Swiss-Prot record:
It catalyses: uridine(38/39/40) in tRNA = pseudouridine(38/39/40) in tRNA. Keywords: Isomerase, tRNA processing. It holds the Pfam family PseudoU_synth_1. The gene is truA. SUPFAM superfamilies: Pseudouridine synthase. This is tRNA pseudouridine synthase A. Substrate binds at residue 110. One of its GO terms (biological process) is tRNA pseudouridine synthesis. NCBIfam families: hisT_truA (TIGR00071). The keyword tRNA processing applies. The keyword tRNA processing applies. Its EC number is 5.4.99.12. Formation of pseudouridine at positions 38, 39 and 40 in the anticodon stem and loop of transfer RNAs. Belongs to the tRNA pseudouridine synthase TruA family.
């Protein structure tokens, strides 16, 4: 029995989420249907990160146990040939039997994209959240530094959580860029794991900082759970799961494969 890992990107607009659900299309459902079409096997795909309806991914990871004899290159080409247009396989590699896409991960990286132009770009409407008021990105970047380190992020979460709500945030920053002359604000956050709606609540609160509605102390109060009313949930369609990282020895095989199938540049951009 082989254990195959896949690196996946998708446009989350028309999905009800990444996990199997009974009320519409899911990323997991589409992947499993494509796998069965390619290999004849009915297998369960294990996803590294759970994304909500409308959330996109540039570097989702899944693994599947299989008896297929298809080469890795054939798996990539074959899945991309039968998957719907809003999902793509970027890479595939062999992993040890004990590898688990979710539980073996040591770092997850998310990006939130804000269209901050004078008028919203129609080209970005499904892939960036529009904020009309010019944001003070420097103030947002100063505020977000407070989340770096080990903290209880329960004040930024929604709904019941499994186990501890303490997470380790490795990096967090707010920067500016432009696409087609349209100013964008990028919010990047990396942590060992995330709680439900943690990034979207963080972003929504940071927008309050950028608009001058709350200051750094107000942001700190939200993080401490002392000012839950100032917390705002940002729209799903601006959020991207950019990458999932694994222990260094688990990526060596991936590096070899990616070079072999000619998608090194794609993987390096994750």
């Amino acid at each position: 029995m082989r254990n195959i890992a896949l690196r996946i990107e998708y446009d989350g607009t028309d999905f009800v989420g990444s996990q199997w659900q009974t009320n519409g299309r899911s990323v997991q459902g589409a992947l499993e249907a494509a796998w069965q079409q390619l290999t004849g096997e009915r297998r369960r795909m294990i996803l590294a990160g759970r994304t909500d309806a409308g959330v996109h991914a540039r570097g989702q990871v899944a693994n599947v146990s299989t008896n297929t004899r298809h080469s890795l290159a054939t798996i990539i080409r074959g899945l991309n040939g039968v998957l719907p247009e809003d999902i793509g396989i970027l890479a595939a590699w062999e992993v040890p039997e004990e590898f688990h896409a979710r539980y073996s991960a040591v770092r997850r990286e998310y990006r939130y994209v804000i269209d901050n132009g004078r008028t919203p770009s129609p080209l970005l409407r499904r892939h960036a959240a529009y904020v009309p008021r010019r944001l003070d990105v420097a103030a947002m970047d100063r505020a977000i530094q407070q989340v770096i380190g080990t903290h209880d992020f329960a004040p930024l979460s929604d709904g019941p959580q499994e186990g501890s709500t303490v997470r380790i945030c490795y990096d967090a920053r707010c920067t500016c860029t432009e696409v087609w002359g349209q100013p964008l604000v990028l919010i990047d956050v990396a942590a060992n794991a995330f709680l439900r709606h943690m990034v979207r609540n963080l972003v929504g609160t940071l927008i309050q900082v950028g608009e001058g509605r709350i200051d750094a102390d107000g942001f700190a109060a939200v993080l401490a759970g002392a000012n839950r009313r100032a917390r705002v949930l940002a729209p799903a369609h601006g959020l991207y799961l950019m990458a999932v990282r694994y222990p260094e020895d688990g990526n060596a095989a991936a590096d070899t494969l990616v070079a072999a199938v000619g998608v090194t540049e794609t993987r390096m951009q994750l």
